[in-house]
Amino acid sequence: MGDRVILHSDINCCYASIEHLHHPELAGKPLAVGGDPEARHGIVLTADYIAKKYGVKTGMALWQAKQICPDITFVSPRMDLYLRFSRMAHEIYAEYTDRQEPYGIDECWLDVTGSSSLKGDGLLIAQEISRRMKSELGITVSVGVSFNKIFAKLGSDYKKPDAITTMYKSEFKQKAWSLPVADLLYVGKSTNRKLALFGIKTIGDLARADEDVLNSHLGKMGGILWSFANGYDDSPVKLENAHAPIKSVGNSTTTPKDLVCDEDVKIVLYILAESVAARLRENGFQCRVVEISVRDNELFSFTRQKKIDHATNITGEIAAYAYQIFKENYNWSKPIRSVGVRGADLVTDNYWEQIDLFSSVEKREKQMKMDSAVDEIRRRFGFYSIQRGLMYRDRILSAVNAKEEHTVHPHGYFG
């Protein structure tokens, strides 16, 4: 059996590139998306390449960016606009494969192994996607072409902007092993520091290291990273819209900025709970288990779940349980980058159970009616036609339409 053909497409400076399309008067001028430009607070979510040449970086405070790049223009984020472009990009990808796995709004893996007889080899498909993104959407992408997901991602990071890089079996050692080990997916700052203690500075150093030593100091992650560095990654690209029996309903997102307090997490959990609850109702299910997943900015992740008192598909109940689980299990040792909510142990809507006499049946019925009304309003007028008051506390965090954008992140190695 031949090698797989995996692409990783990354929209260059996604938010900033899209804003440039809508602000032609800023052509050739530095631009950054983030925070509240009028209030002069917040952080940079993304900067264009002109601003980056001045040293402007993602996560930098707006006032700092202004200091090092006085001519920079700040624009407020418009997540609905960026999501629309993301959908259009996925429509292009879908013409080459139904195996596409998003990694945030701007990145996506594509398994085009079965497309070569009709569309050409991986390099040819990458070139065609790159051309179409420019001509049809007006934006550029960097694409990695490889035999697995890890090196395809490394390939898209290898050269930017508007570039295509191959990482074939015959060449990955030559191209990848000299790169800093921090360039490898899932090597965060903390892991990078630990590896440095063993003299591991490059991907090649990691590949040549003793796997048992890595396992003893890094646990399961040591062996995983050693495998990645040596090209051993057989994780599949998920099949889009695969029709499998529904065992759980969940959603996760990498947030536009790091979450640093309970209030930040509460906003995102409610957005995700709205998505999960709405999908449960659409499919005629209720859940008896609520689960959350959390990944910090060092890419350490954990999941926790709770068996709840009664089956539910009520948004407020799922959100409240999710927030309770979070409060009981997270100590804020690090900021948070990614959050997920899942409803499991599903039963059908007509499932009967005895309700606790002390619970407010009337209150639950009112909540169910309210959820149904919200569902109908959003069906008719769009997701943003009605939002919870909580969402207005942070315009950036509340901008993602989690119901419509099921952003899935690779987590099979961290189960």
Named regions from a protein language model:
Residues Y323-R380:
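C-terminal hydrophobic structural anchor segments
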Residues Y103-E107, S146-K149, F285-V289, K334-S338:
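Short Gly/Ser/Thr- and Asp/Glu-enriched loop/turn motifs at secondary-structure junctions
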Residues C108-G114, T303-K306, E353-S359:
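Short, hydrophobic beta-strand segments
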Residues M1-S227, V237-E240, A278, R364-G415:
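Gly/Gly-Pro- and Ser/Thr-rich, intrinsically disordered tail segments characteristic of DNA damage-repair
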Residues H8, D183, T191-I336:
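DNA-contacting surface of Y-family translesion DNA polymerases
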Residues C14, P37-R40, N297-F300, L346-D349:
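Short, charged/polar surface micro-motifs in flexible loops or helix N-caps
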